[in-house]
Protein backbone atom coordinates (compact mmCIF):
# COMPACT_ATOMS: atom_id res chain seq x y z
CA UNK A 1 0.00 0.00 0.00
CA UNK A 2 2.88 2.39 0.79
CA UNK A 3 4.49 1.80 -2.64
CA UNK A 4 1.10 2.46 -4.26
CA UNK A 5 0.84 5.75 -2.36
CA UNK A 6 4.42 6.73 -3.29
CA UNK A 7 3.71 6.15 -6.98
CA UNK A 8 0.43 8.07 -6.71
CA UNK A 9 2.10 11.01 -4.97
CA UNK A 10 4.98 11.24 -7.44
CA UNK A 11 2.55 11.14 -10.36
CA UNK A 12 0.30 13.82 -8.86
CA UNK A 13 3.31 16.03 -8.13
CA UNK A 14 4.55 15.90 -11.73
CA UNK A 15 1.01 16.44 -12.99
CA UNK A 16 0.68 19.57 -10.84
CA UNK A 17 3.71 21.14 -12.50
CA UNK A 18 2.34 20.22 -15.93
CA UNK A 19 -1.00 21.84 -15.02
CA UNK A 20 0.78 25.09 -14.22
CA UNK A 21 2.54 25.03 -17.58
CA UNK A 22 -0.72 24.33 -19.44
CA UNK A 23 -2.54 27.18 -17.69
CA UNK A 24 0.28 29.66 -18.30
CA UNK A 25 0.44 28.64 -21.97
CA UNK A 26 -3.33 29.18 -22.34
CA UNK A 27 -3.09 32.64 -20.75
CA UNK A 28 -0.19 33.63 -23.01
CA UNK A 29 -1.84 32.44 -26.23
CA UNK A 30 -5.26 33.93 -25.45
CA UNK A 31 -3.65 37.30 -24.70
CA UNK A 32 -1.50 37.39 -27.82
CA UNK A 33 -2.16 37.97 -31.54
CA UNK A 34 -2.83 34.21 -31.71
CA UNK A 35 -5.92 34.44 -29.49
CA UNK A 36 -8.19 33.80 -32.48
CA UNK A 37 -6.55 30.39 -32.89
CA UNK A 38 -7.21 29.55 -29.24
CA UNK A 39 -10.91 30.40 -29.32
CA UNK A 40 -11.31 28.97 -32.81
CA UNK A 41 -9.82 25.64 -31.77
CA UNK A 42 -12.12 25.27 -28.78
CA UNK A 43 -15.16 26.16 -30.90
CA UNK A 44 -14.43 23.55 -33.60
CA UNK A 45 -17.60 21.46 -33.98
CA UNK A 46 -17.12 17.73 -33.42
CA UNK A 47 -19.95 15.32 -34.23
CA UNK A 48 -20.35 11.58 -33.73
CA UNK A 49 -23.26 9.81 -35.42
CA UNK A 50 -24.19 6.14 -35.13
CA UNK A 51 -27.52 5.43 -36.78
CA UNK A 52 -30.15 7.67 -35.20
CA UNK A 53 -27.79 8.67 -32.39
CA UNK A 54 -26.12 12.02 -33.02
CA UNK A 55 -23.85 13.84 -30.57
CA UNK A 56 -22.59 17.21 -31.82
CA UNK A 57 -20.63 19.54 -29.54
CA UNK A 58 -17.79 22.06 -29.81
CA UNK A 59 -14.38 20.68 -28.87
CA UNK A 60 -14.47 22.48 -25.50
CA UNK A 61 -17.56 20.54 -24.41
CA UNK A 62 -16.11 17.24 -25.62
CA UNK A 63 -13.20 17.93 -23.29
CA UNK A 64 -15.41 18.99 -20.38
CA UNK A 65 -18.12 16.33 -20.78
CA UNK A 66 -16.17 13.49 -22.39
CA UNK A 67 -12.55 13.45 -21.28
CA UNK A 68 -13.44 14.67 -17.80
CA UNK A 69 -15.70 11.63 -17.43
CA UNK A 70 -12.47 9.60 -17.46
CA UNK A 71 -11.09 11.86 -14.74
CA UNK A 72 -14.18 11.21 -12.62
CA UNK A 73 -13.88 7.49 -13.41
CA UNK A 74 -10.40 7.64 -11.88
CA UNK A 75 -11.70 9.55 -8.84
CA UNK A 76 -14.41 6.91 -8.39
CA UNK A 77 -11.84 4.11 -8.57
CA UNK A 78 -9.63 5.85 -5.99
CA UNK A 79 -12.56 6.47 -3.64
CA UNK A 80 -13.75 2.85 -3.87
CA UNK A 81 -10.24 1.50 -3.27
CA UNK A 82 -9.72 3.78 -0.27
CA UNK A 83 -13.12 2.92 1.24
CA UNK A 84 -12.79 -0.84 0.75
CA UNK A 85 -9.10 -1.36 1.44
CA UNK A 86 -7.34 1.93 2.14
CA UNK A 87 -7.15 5.04 4.29
CA UNK A 88 -10.94 5.45 4.33
CA UNK A 89 -11.61 1.85 5.45
CA UNK A 90 -11.19 2.60 9.17
CA UNK A 91 -13.40 5.25 10.82
CA UNK A 92 -10.51 6.39 13.01
CA UNK A 93 -8.48 7.27 9.91
CA UNK A 94 -11.36 9.12 8.25
CA UNK A 95 -12.57 11.39 11.04
CA UNK A 96 -9.88 14.10 10.81
CA UNK A 97 -9.64 14.51 6.99
CA UNK A 98 -13.42 14.15 6.63
CA UNK A 99 -14.05 16.84 9.25
CA UNK A 100 -11.47 19.09 7.59
CA UNK A 101 -13.01 18.47 4.15
CA UNK A 102 -16.49 19.45 5.39
CA UNK A 103 -15.11 22.69 6.81
CA UNK A 104 -13.22 23.29 3.57
CA UNK A 105 -16.45 23.08 1.59
CA UNK A 106 -18.94 24.81 3.87
CA UNK A 107 -16.94 27.93 4.84
CA UNK A 108 -15.89 28.91 1.25
CA UNK A 109 -19.47 28.41 0.06
CA UNK A 110 -20.79 30.67 2.83
CA UNK A 111 -18.20 33.35 2.08
CA UNK A 112 -19.06 33.32 -1.63
CA UNK A 113 -22.79 33.42 -0.87
CA UNK A 114 -22.36 36.33 1.55
CA UNK A 115 -20.41 38.41 -0.99
CA UNK A 116 -22.89 37.66 -3.82
CA UNK A 117 -26.11 37.33 -1.79
CA UNK A 118 -27.82 40.27 -3.54
CA UNK A 119 -27.35 38.79 -7.03
CA UNK A 120 -29.35 35.57 -7.64
CA UNK A 121 -27.60 34.89 -10.96
CA UNK A 122 -24.15 35.14 -9.37
CA UNK A 123 -25.12 32.99 -6.38
CA UNK A 124 -25.18 29.99 -8.76
CA UNK A 125 -21.39 29.89 -8.45
CA UNK A 126 -21.42 29.14 -4.72
CA UNK A 127 -19.80 25.71 -5.19
CA UNK A 128 -16.81 26.99 -7.21
CA UNK A 129 -14.54 27.80 -4.22
CA UNK A 130 -15.43 24.54 -2.42
CA UNK A 131 -13.16 22.41 -4.64
CA UNK A 132 -9.52 21.39 -4.16
CA UNK A 133 -7.20 20.39 -7.01
CA UNK A 134 -5.47 17.30 -5.63
CA UNK A 135 -2.79 17.22 -8.34
CA UNK A 136 -1.84 20.88 -7.92
CA UNK A 137 -1.92 20.81 -4.10
CA UNK A 138 0.19 17.65 -3.87
CA UNK A 139 2.52 19.05 -6.52
CA UNK A 140 3.25 22.10 -4.37
CA UNK A 141 3.68 19.98 -1.24
CA UNK A 142 6.09 17.72 -3.16
CA UNK A 143 8.46 20.67 -3.60
CA UNK A 144 9.23 20.40 0.12
CA UNK A 145 10.42 16.82 -0.27
CA UNK A 146 11.30 14.97 2.93
CA UNK A 147 10.89 18.07 5.07
CA UNK A 148 7.21 17.18 5.52
CA UNK A 149 6.17 13.86 7.11
CA UNK A 150 4.46 11.22 4.98
CA UNK A 151 1.48 11.39 7.35
CA UNK A 152 0.89 15.02 6.32
CA UNK A 153 0.87 14.06 2.64
CA UNK A 154 -1.57 11.25 3.42
CA UNK A 155 -3.77 13.72 5.30
CA UNK A 156 -3.86 16.09 2.32
CA UNK A 157 -4.47 13.27 -0.16
CA UNK A 158 -7.32 11.77 1.88
CA UNK A 159 -8.85 15.20 2.50
CA UNK A 160 -8.73 15.99 -1.23
CA UNK A 161 -10.32 12.65 -2.16
CA UNK A 162 -13.19 13.28 0.27
CA UNK A 163 -13.43 16.81 -1.14
CA UNK A 164 -13.73 15.33 -4.64
CA UNK A 165 -16.48 13.03 -3.40
CA UNK A 166 -18.30 16.08 -2.05
CA UNK A 167 -17.89 17.81 -5.41
CA UNK A 168 -19.46 14.80 -7.14
CA UNK A 169 -22.49 15.01 -4.84
CA UNK A 170 -22.79 18.77 -5.42
CA UNK A 171 -22.67 18.32 -9.21
CA UNK A 172 -25.33 15.60 -9.09
CA UNK A 173 -27.68 17.60 -6.85
CA UNK A 174 -27.24 21.18 -8.02
CA UNK A 175 -25.80 21.26 -11.54
CA UNK A 176 -28.02 18.95 -13.55
CA UNK A 177 -30.29 20.23 -16.32
CA UNK A 178 -33.80 19.29 -17.41
CA UNK A 179 -34.13 15.55 -16.91
CA UNK A 180 -35.16 13.02 -19.57
CA UNK A 181 -37.01 10.08 -18.02
CA UNK A 182 -36.31 7.76 -20.97
CA UNK A 183 -32.56 8.41 -20.86
CA UNK A 184 -32.53 8.02 -17.07
CA UNK A 185 -34.30 4.65 -17.36
CA UNK A 186 -31.76 3.50 -19.95
CA UNK A 187 -28.94 4.69 -17.70
CA UNK A 188 -30.49 2.77 -14.79
CA UNK A 189 -30.66 -0.34 -16.99
CA UNK A 190 -26.95 0.03 -17.77
CA UNK A 191 -26.22 0.27 -14.05
CA UNK A 192 -28.21 -2.90 -13.38
CA UNK A 193 -26.16 -4.72 -16.03
CA UNK A 194 -22.89 -3.43 -14.53
CA UNK A 195 -23.89 -4.47 -11.01
CA UNK A 196 -24.95 -7.91 -12.29
CA UNK A 197 -21.60 -8.34 -14.04
CA UNK A 198 -19.84 -7.48 -10.80
CA UNK A 199 -21.92 -9.94 -8.77
CA UNK A 200 -21.46 -12.70 -11.36
CA UNK A 201 -17.70 -12.37 -11.13
CA UNK A 202 -16.93 -10.83 -14.52
CA UNK A 203 -13.30 -9.70 -14.34
CA UNK A 204 -12.56 -8.69 -17.94
CA UNK A 205 -12.51 -4.89 -18.23
CA UNK A 206 -13.71 -4.86 -21.86
CA UNK A 207 -17.41 -5.56 -21.11
CA UNK A 208 -17.41 -2.95 -18.33
CA UNK A 209 -15.96 -0.34 -20.69
CA UNK A 210 -18.54 -1.08 -23.42
CA UNK A 211 -21.49 -0.82 -21.02
CA UNK A 212 -19.82 2.20 -19.42
CA UNK A 213 -19.68 3.98 -22.77
CA UNK A 214 -23.39 3.30 -23.33
CA UNK A 215 -24.03 4.56 -19.78
CA UNK A 216 -22.12 7.77 -20.56
CA UNK A 217 -24.28 8.43 -23.65
CA UNK A 218 -27.48 7.80 -21.66
CA UNK A 219 -26.39 10.09 -18.83
CA UNK A 220 -25.30 12.75 -21.34
CA UNK A 221 -28.78 12.70 -22.89
CA UNK A 222 -30.56 12.51 -19.52
CA UNK A 223 -29.77 16.01 -18.25
CA UNK A 224 -27.55 14.74 -15.42
CA UNK A 225 -23.95 15.79 -15.97
CA UNK A 226 -22.20 13.15 -18.07
CA UNK A 227 -19.09 12.98 -15.89
CA UNK A 228 -21.14 11.24 -13.19
CA UNK A 229 -21.30 8.20 -15.48
CA UNK A 230 -17.59 7.76 -14.81
CA UNK A 231 -18.20 7.63 -11.05
CA UNK A 232 -21.07 5.14 -11.43
CA UNK A 233 -18.94 2.89 -13.64
CA UNK A 234 -16.04 3.02 -11.17
CA UNK A 235 -18.21 1.79 -8.30
CA UNK A 236 -19.13 -1.29 -10.34
CA UNK A 237 -15.56 -2.33 -11.19
CA UNK A 238 -14.55 -5.22 -8.88
CA UNK A 239 -11.62 -4.59 -6.54
CA UNK A 240 -11.13 -8.21 -5.54
CA UNK A 241 -11.61 -11.43 -7.52
CA UNK A 242 -11.57 -15.14 -6.73
CA UNK A 243 -8.00 -15.07 -7.98
CA UNK A 244 -6.38 -12.86 -5.36
CA UNK A 245 -3.48 -12.05 -7.68
CA UNK A 246 -5.63 -9.96 -10.02
CA UNK A 247 -7.63 -6.80 -9.38
CA UNK A 248 -9.59 -5.25 -12.28
CA UNK A 249 -9.97 -2.00 -10.33
CA UNK A 250 -6.25 -1.61 -9.65
CA UNK A 251 -5.41 -2.56 -13.23
CA UNK A 252 -7.77 0.09 -14.61
CA UNK A 253 -6.60 2.68 -12.08
CA UNK A 254 -2.95 2.13 -13.01
CA UNK A 255 -3.76 2.29 -16.72
CA UNK A 256 -5.82 5.49 -16.41
CA UNK A 257 -3.61 7.41 -14.02
CA UNK A 258 -0.84 8.48 -16.44
CA UNK A 259 -3.38 9.48 -19.12
CA UNK A 260 -5.39 11.57 -16.67
CA UNK A 261 -2.32 13.12 -15.01
CA UNK A 262 -0.32 13.90 -18.12
CA UNK A 263 -2.95 14.39 -20.82
CA UNK A 264 -6.56 14.89 -19.72
CA UNK A 265 -6.07 17.33 -16.83
CA UNK A 266 -3.43 19.47 -18.60
CA UNK A 267 -5.67 19.57 -21.70
CA UNK A 268 -8.63 20.59 -19.54
CA UNK A 269 -6.52 23.30 -17.87
CA UNK A 270 -5.36 24.58 -21.25
CA UNK A 271 -8.94 24.67 -22.59
CA UNK A 272 -10.45 26.41 -19.56
CA UNK A 273 -7.75 28.65 -18.08
CA UNK A 274 -7.31 30.98 -21.06
CA UNK A 275 -8.77 34.15 -19.56
CA UNK A 276 -8.59 37.22 -21.79
CA UNK A 277 -7.05 40.10 -19.85
CA UNK A 278 -8.01 42.70 -22.46
CA UNK A 279 -9.81 45.65 -20.91
CA UNK A 280 -9.44 44.37 -17.36
CA UNK A 281 -9.18 46.91 -14.57
CA UNK A 282 -8.93 46.80 -10.79
CA UNK A 283 -12.73 46.87 -10.74
CA UNK A 284 -12.75 43.62 -12.74
CA UNK A 285 -10.99 41.83 -9.89
CA UNK A 286 -13.12 43.43 -7.18
CA UNK A 287 -16.40 42.35 -8.79
CA UNK A 288 -18.34 40.18 -6.30
CA UNK A 289 -18.00 36.99 -8.42
CA UNK A 290 -14.18 36.82 -8.73
CA UNK A 291 -13.83 38.37 -5.28
CA UNK A 292 -16.13 35.77 -3.72
CA UNK A 293 -14.25 32.93 -5.41
CA UNK A 294 -10.76 34.21 -4.57
CA UNK A 295 -11.62 35.02 -0.94
CA UNK A 296 -13.52 31.74 -0.62
CA UNK A 297 -10.52 29.75 -1.86
CA UNK A 298 -7.82 31.61 0.05
CA UNK A 299 -9.56 32.56 3.30
CA UNK A 300 -12.54 30.18 3.35
CA UNK A 301 -10.51 27.02 2.76
CA UNK A 302 -7.93 28.06 5.34
CA UNK A 303 -10.50 28.85 8.04
CA UNK A 304 -12.67 25.83 7.23
CA UNK A 305 -9.94 23.19 7.03
CA UNK A 306 -7.74 24.50 9.85
CA UNK A 307 -10.66 25.49 12.08
CA UNK A 308 -12.44 22.14 11.98
CA UNK A 309 -9.15 20.23 12.25
CA UNK A 310 -8.34 22.22 15.41
CA UNK A 311 -11.85 21.60 16.76
CA UNK A 312 -11.71 17.84 16.08
CA UNK A 313 -8.34 17.54 17.85
CA UNK A 314 -9.37 19.71 20.82
CA UNK A 315 -12.56 17.66 21.25
CA UNK A 316 -10.38 14.52 21.10
CA UNK A 317 -12.32 13.15 18.15
CA UNK A 318 -9.03 12.64 16.29
CA UNK A 319 -5.28 13.20 16.59
CA UNK A 320 -2.92 15.22 14.42
CA UNK A 321 -1.06 13.28 11.69
CA UNK A 322 2.04 11.65 13.21
CA UNK A 323 5.01 14.01 13.20
CA UNK A 324 3.00 17.00 11.97
CA UNK A 325 2.64 20.30 13.82
CA UNK A 326 -0.02 22.98 13.77
CA UNK A 327 2.07 25.18 11.50
CA UNK A 328 2.17 22.44 8.88
CA UNK A 329 -1.57 21.87 9.23
CA UNK A 330 -2.08 25.60 8.60
CA UNK A 331 0.09 25.39 5.49
CA UNK A 332 -1.85 22.40 4.16
CA UNK A 333 -5.14 24.19 4.91
CA UNK A 334 -3.99 27.09 2.75
CA UNK A 335 -2.87 24.69 -0.01
CA UNK A 336 -6.42 23.30 -0.05
CA UNK A 337 -7.39 26.68 -1.51
CA UNK A 338 -5.81 25.63 -4.81
CA UNK A 339 -9.08 24.97 -6.60
CA UNK A 340 -7.80 25.23 -10.16
CA UNK A 341 -9.05 22.34 -12.37
CA UNK A 342 -11.89 21.24 -10.09
CA UNK A 343 -13.02 24.84 -9.55
CA UNK A 344 -12.75 25.54 -13.29
CA UNK A 345 -14.89 22.47 -13.93
CA UNK A 346 -17.59 23.49 -11.44
CA UNK A 347 -17.40 27.03 -12.85
CA UNK A 348 -18.09 25.72 -16.35
CA UNK A 349 -21.30 24.17 -14.98
CA UNK A 350 -22.37 27.19 -12.93
CA UNK A 351 -21.57 29.78 -15.61
CA UNK A 352 -21.63 28.17 -19.06
CA UNK A 353 -19.06 29.68 -21.46
CA UNK A 354 -20.77 31.91 -24.01
CA UNK A 355 -24.09 31.99 -22.15
CA UNK A 356 -23.19 33.72 -18.89
CA UNK A 357 -21.71 37.15 -18.26
CA UNK A 358 -19.75 35.64 -15.37
CA UNK A 359 -17.99 32.93 -17.44
CA UNK A 360 -14.72 34.89 -17.60
CA UNK A 361 -15.00 36.45 -14.16
CA UNK A 362 -15.10 33.11 -12.37
CA UNK A 363 -11.84 32.04 -14.01
CA UNK A 364 -10.15 35.27 -12.84
CA UNK A 365 -11.17 34.50 -9.27
CA UNK A 366 -10.10 30.86 -9.54
CA UNK A 367 -6.66 31.64 -10.96
CA UNK A 368 -6.05 34.50 -8.51
CA UNK A 369 -7.17 32.57 -5.43
CA UNK A 370 -5.35 29.39 -6.47
CA UNK A 371 -2.12 31.29 -7.21
CA UNK A 372 -1.98 33.01 -3.83
CA UNK A 373 -3.03 29.81 -2.03
CA UNK A 374 -0.13 27.96 -3.70
CA UNK A 375 2.47 30.63 -2.91
CA UNK A 376 1.36 31.37 0.66
CA UNK A 377 0.63 27.71 1.43
CA UNK A 378 4.10 26.69 0.27
CA UNK A 379 5.77 29.46 2.29
CA UNK A 380 3.87 28.66 5.49
CA UNK A 381 4.46 24.91 5.20
CA UNK A 382 8.16 25.46 4.43
CA UNK A 383 8.65 27.72 7.46
CA UNK A 384 6.76 25.31 9.71
CA UNK A 385 8.89 22.40 8.43
CA UNK A 386 12.27 23.98 9.18
CA UNK A 387 14.41 21.85 11.42
CA UNK A 388 16.21 23.73 14.20
CA UNK A 389 19.94 24.11 13.67
CA UNK A 390 22.20 22.22 16.01
CA UNK A 391 25.06 24.19 17.62
Swiss-Prot record:
Keyword Cell inner membrane in record: yes
Keywords: Antiport, Cell inner membrane, Cell membrane, Ion transport, Membrane, Sodium, Sodium transport, Transmembrane, Transmembrane helix, Transport
Compartments, as annotated in UniProt: Cell inner membrane
Biological process per Gene Ontology, one example term: regulation of pH
Membrane topology: Multi-pass membrane protein
Reactions this protein catalyses: Na(+)(in) + 2 H(+)(out) = Na(+)(out) + 2 H(+)(in)
Transport recorded as keyword: yes
GO molecular function ontology, one term from the record: sodium:proton antiporter activity
InterPro entries: Na/H_antiporter_dom_sf, NhaA
Transmembrane segments: 9-29, 36-56, 59-79, 95-115, 123-143, 154-174, 177-197, 213-235, 259-279, 293-313, 329-349, 364-384
One Gene Ontology term, aspect cellular component: plasma membrane
A Pfam short name: Na_H_antiport_1
PANTHER family in UniProt: NA(+)_H(+) ANTIPORTER NHAA (PTHR30341:SF0), SODIUM ION/PROTON ANTIPORTER NHAA-RELATED (PTHR30341)
Function according to Swiss-Prot or TrEMBL: Na(+)/H(+) antiporter that extrudes sodium in exchange for external protons.
Family listed: Belongs to the NhaA Na(+)/H(+) (TC 2.A.33) antiporter family.
Name by which UniProt lists this protein: Na(+)/H(+) antiporter NhaA
Amino acid sequence: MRSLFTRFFQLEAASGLLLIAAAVLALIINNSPLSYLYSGLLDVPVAVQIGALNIAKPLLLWINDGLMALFFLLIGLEVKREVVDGHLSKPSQVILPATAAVGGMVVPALIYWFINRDNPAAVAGWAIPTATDIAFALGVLALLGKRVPVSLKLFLMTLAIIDDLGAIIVIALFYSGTLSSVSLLLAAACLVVLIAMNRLGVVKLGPYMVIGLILWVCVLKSGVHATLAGVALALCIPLRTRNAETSPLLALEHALHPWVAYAILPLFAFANAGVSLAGMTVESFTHPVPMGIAVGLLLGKTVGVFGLTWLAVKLRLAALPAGAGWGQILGVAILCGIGFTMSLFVGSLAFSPGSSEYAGMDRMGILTGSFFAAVIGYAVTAMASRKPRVG
